[in-house]
Amino acid sequence: MEDPDIKRCKLSCVATVDDVIEQVMTYITDPKDRDSASLVCRRWFKIDSETREHVTMALCYTATPDRLSRRFPNLRSLKLKGKPRAAMFNLIPENWGGYVTPWVTEISNNLRQLKSVHFRRMIVSDLDLDRLAKARADDLETLKLDKCSGFTTDGLLSIVTHCRKIKTLLMEESSFSEKDGKWLHELAQHNTSLEVLNFYMTEFAKISPKDLETIARNCRSLVSVKVGDFEILELVGFFKAAANLEEFCGGSLNEDIGMPEKYMNLVFPRKLCRLGLSYMGPNEMPILFPFAAQIRKLDLLYALLETEDHCTLIQKCPNLEVLETRNVIGDRGLEVLAQYCKQLKRLRIERGADEQGMEDEEGLVSQRGLIALAQGCQELEYMAVYVSDITNESLESIGTYLKNLCDFRLVLLDREERITDLPLDNGVRSLLIGCKKLRRFAFYLRQGGLTDLGLSYIGQYSPNVRWMLLGYVGESDEGLMEFSRGCPNLQKLEMRGCCFSERAIAAAVTKLPSLRYLWVQGYRASMTGQDLMQMARPYWNIELIPSRRVPEVNQQGEIREMEHPAHILAYYSLAGQRTDCPTTVRVLKEPI
């Protein structure tokens, strides 16, 4: 019989080891590392289950709500994504799916520790918001309705009425029905905890600037506010009251020919260092000069500035870390950025609207600007850019100098008939070899931009990339097969406008060992999709959206029907086939 003292000692050692593992586990935040740790043994699995505080689900159909709550009963933060990313570009049917209702039900019933909820590209009803508000009440600290739809201001009123201690409320780029402005008034009257309020890029028209001023006065911890198109002079009282504000985005500056200096006396909070003013023109730009040296983030996506205006402003922002703008910045603007902003970490350059006068050569981004940027801003970690011209040399420069780059996205516009240097095979190889920290990679070109050899380079030299978007790359199925022999850690693959057959796509999927999600639009589609069944396996859902004609408004305001090519969406799911597919989605279950 075992000695009682020895038995007690063994039990004590086990308990001590468990305590140590539990303490260590709290410092493991990368989901992939967490997953690996949980597979060591049953004890580690249980500790991970009990201590995991945050989960992000890249697609809400990959597991059932009750399975998630059983696996991680003590979650404090949950992020759910619904519609595929392509929905942001109007490529996915509005009724595709992504309903939050089953998740809200589970949160209300079983996830009692949850304090932060983030829904992205999902359909949210007023009933969902009301149930969430009543279930979590003052325990809910963060609610993000990120690019969501389906609710009204009644749902928001329920949230702010029942969740009086909410710290973050976000509705950026969401679409909804506005009945009144009671929700903001209620928030202003009864909340003293708010830190972040964001309804940027929304169409609220019935809310009062006075309520924003009251919020600023009552919530001393308010550090970030992003709003819609308020006339900026209506926010003078808000700016005066928001003593601790660090970030502001939105508003509206409207040039008045009869009053050229009407904004010159506008005073911003002294701690403001992240800023974006909608419709700011060159005449209003000087209001930023007094505190430009302290600006860390600048959003110029909706400013009305030309290339030289960018140059003038950027020179005055030597501590800039984040810049978002449009390609009107031009090569000249990027050269100034490279010269003056050595601490830049994130750069996003979107495509400018055609009506903004892009015919001016100054308003174009090309290899010249990219080379200057790579040499001058070597702290860059994120770079997303639309270019009008490109060379292999510019990509090689990025690989040579930007060693901290984790996320790189490049789109080659189709406005120029001739591109200086195609294909980009050698350039992309040099970039991927040099940027060893890359985790996210998007390369969206045009026909002839990348050969099969270049596509094989992407597979060979992307050992750590987890998400990838490829557009108009490769020449044949063989290129895709060579690509699929690499990318050992690729989890999400999106492709558009490629020449691959269904058979090649299915074969490539089976060779990518870590792949969990696939979206393809614009491939050699068949009538039946039968060849896609070669990638069928347990827990792997395959959905098709057949080609369809969709009404779109062109630049002249005319409504015309556009042809949308067929889509493939395939993903791992422990929940099986979803039950809410609309008629526009066809589920592949077995060979036809």
Swiss-Prot record:
What's the reported outcome of changing residue 22 to A?
Abrogates SFC(COI1) complexes formation, loss of response to jasmonate
* Protein name listed in UniProt: Coronatine-insensitive protein 1
Q: In which pathway does it act?
A: Protein modification; protein ubiquitination
Key words of the record: Jasmonic acid signaling pathway, Leucine-rich repeat, Plant defense, Repeat, Ubl conjugation pathway
Q: What is the effect of changing residue 89 to A?
A: Loss of interaction with TIFY10A
Primary role: Required for jasmonate-regulated plant fertility and defense processes, and for coronatine and/or other elicitors perceptions/responses. Seems to not be required for meiosis. Required for the regulation of some genes induced by wounding, but not for all. Component of SCF(COI1) E3 ubiquitin ligase complexes, which may mediate the ubiquitination and subsequent proteasomal degradation of target proteins (probably including the ribulose bisphosphate carboxylase small chain 1B RBCS-1B and the histone deacetylase HDA6).
Q: Where are the LRR repeats?
A: 58-82, 83-102, 103-120, 121-154, 155-182, 183-210, 211-236, 237-264, 265-283, 284-308, 309-332, 333-368, 369-393, 394-426, 427-456, 457-478, 479-500, 501-524
The cysteines covalently paired via disulfide bonds are: none
Query: Which cellular component terms (GO) are annotated to the entry?
Result: SCF ubiquitin ligase complex
* Species of the source: Arabidopsis thaliana (Mouse-ear cress)
